[in-house]
């Protein structure tokens, strides 16, 4: 999909071959599913935080790609012998193969009875990072715009649909004329 991002009076400049970084937000469905799985309300403010769990999971934390800390925690606490053996082996490729296509919710659900405190959970997650995309335009022709060509990442695994964080943020969540956080 072709996107045109207006630079307005930002003063941002670019050259051929540069990239632009976009700060996405997480999908509402996944955010709500994790909040439900944690057993708290959307407006819960976890101990040690100023924002609600909904804001934290939407804007601040990576909930698509499970962190090493989360995987180790689940392996230790879930009672899943296969995952525990895999993590104990420290075989990075085998762990990558195991977690391929899985998100944070999938790991939380390895043992549906596993309770995770909200503050502990957030400590196991990584910060939501910007995503960089190659610019497909030239300032010589478009001095107030950045053009991007982005393919939306989507897949289905078992009964769930999965979405890339930023590619589908651009495709589904940013309205024409809407604002983005970029650098």
Language-model segments: which ranges?
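FNR-like FAD-binding dehydrogenase module
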Residues: 1-183
